[in-house]
Regions:
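Residues that define the transmembrane beta-barrel architecture of outer-membrane proteins
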Residues: 82-86, 116-123, 140, 167-173, ...
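Repeated loop/turn-to-beta-strand initiation elements of outer-membrane beta-barrel proteins
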Residues: 97-102, 134-137, 186-190, 240-243, ...
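Residues on the lipid-exposed face of transmembrane beta-strands in outer-membrane beta-barrel proteins
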Residues: 45, 56-58, 88-92, 102, ...
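Transmembrane beta-strands of outer-membrane beta-barrel pores
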Residues: 60-66, 76, 104-110, 131, ...
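Detector for outer-membrane/organellar transmembrane beta-barrel domains
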Residues: 51-63, 163-263
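Outer membrane beta-barrel transmembrane domains
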Residues: 63-76, 215-320
Length: 320
């Protein structure tokens, strides 16, 4: 090979070898200069998606209850139980204002027969409609949502040693209002939401159930209203990293269980109202504008007649 050709060959090889490095450098530069990224906190819902845009965010959650709050709000230690849940929200923008979605779930828990088993959880279908889209730096948005819970999980016949408690048994309707705005030149995003479960939900019960009934019971549970309120803030410290602070207040106005036990005696029990206040710190890592990971924990810090949950969780958010 001539010296001239050898020189050209070496030059070509050097250029080819440097091209990936150059591309990576450009990508790194682009990443460093990129805008702040957000994928949403653990609990506060998102506003409607643009038309033709979809989102899926599978969660893996492990929940323990090392204590409970009594009727006076005192924290009392208890034997911790652990349950694993997979929760998969899926949303799609039909128009710029209307987003439809569904949430699938499954539980993996200990069973009476020993070991663990999995079961399908309740399913939710939803519709979200944008009420206001603001201009300017804050880009404030307001939306209203309607969610219907379908009782696809297990809530009774729990005396079966192979059966996992994974649902409520009740078809319920929830109405929600939620808002979002940006601050600090787009580096801080705030969300707030409140949701009300409408009255009238009820579940038929046979045997042992999530409502505290025993084997042989036949009757029903009627659920009162419930409310969940969240506030959150996401702060972008780097194009790839976002810190999340969130608080959640949940209130259940009790339920009533009526029926007959295994001896044929009448049962009429009113469960008291309960509430819980939780903190949900989290951190986000963004692989790109459309893919990110969030990891955090729900910590029940105060309440009445409810468990002091500790629920570490991780999710992958994918836009498409």
């Amino acid at each position: 090979m001539s010296v001239h050709r050898l020189a050209l060959s070496r030059a070509g090889f050097a250029i080819a070898a440097l091209l990936p490095v150059s591309v990576l450098a450009q990508v790194a530069d682009t990443t460093d200069d990129a805008h702040p990224r957000f994928i949403g906190p653990l609990a506060s819902p998102a506003p409607p998606l643009p038309r033709g845009v979809g989102n899926i965010e599978p969660y893996l959650v492990t929940t323990t209850a090392p204590a409970f709050f009594d009727a006076d709000g005192h924290r009392i230690d208890s034997q911790a139980t652990t349950q694993w849940d997979v929760i998969v929200p899926i949303q799609y923008g039909l128009t710029d204002r209307l987003t439809v979605g569904t949430t699938l779930s499954a539980a993996y828990d200990r069973i009476v027969a020993g070991g663990r088993a999995a079961a399908l959880g309740d399913t939710t279908v939803s519709a979200l409609y944008g009420l206001y889209d603001g201009a300017g730096g804050n880009r404030a948005r307001l939306a209203a949502g309607l969610r219907q819970r379908l009782p696809s999980g297990h809530h009774d016949h729990l005396e079966d040693p192979r059966r996992v408690a994974s649902g409520s048994g009740a078809s319920s309707t929830t109405f929600a209002l939620q808002g979002q705005a940006y601050f600090l030149d787009g580096h801080l995003r705030a969300r707030a939401s409140t949701a009300w479960r409408l009255p009238g939900s009820h579940a038929r019960i046979h045997g042992a159930s999530v409502y505290g009934t025993d084997a042989g019971f036949i009757g029903n549970a009627r659920l009162a209203t419930a409310q969940t309120t969240t506030v959150s803030a996401e702060y972008s410290v780097h194009p790839r990293w976002t810190l999340v602070g969130e608080a959640m207040y949940e209130r259940e106005n009790g339920h009533r269980v009526r029926g007959r036990d295994t001896d044929g005696l009448a049962v009429d029990v009113h469960a008291p109202a309960s509430w819980r206040f939780s903190l949900l710190p989290a951190v986000q890592y963004h692989l790109s504008d459309s893919v990110g990971v969030i990891a955090g924990v729900q910590l029940g810090v105060a309440g009445r007649n409810t468990s002091a949950v500790v629920a570490p969780q991780i999710a992958v958010n994918v836009g498409f």
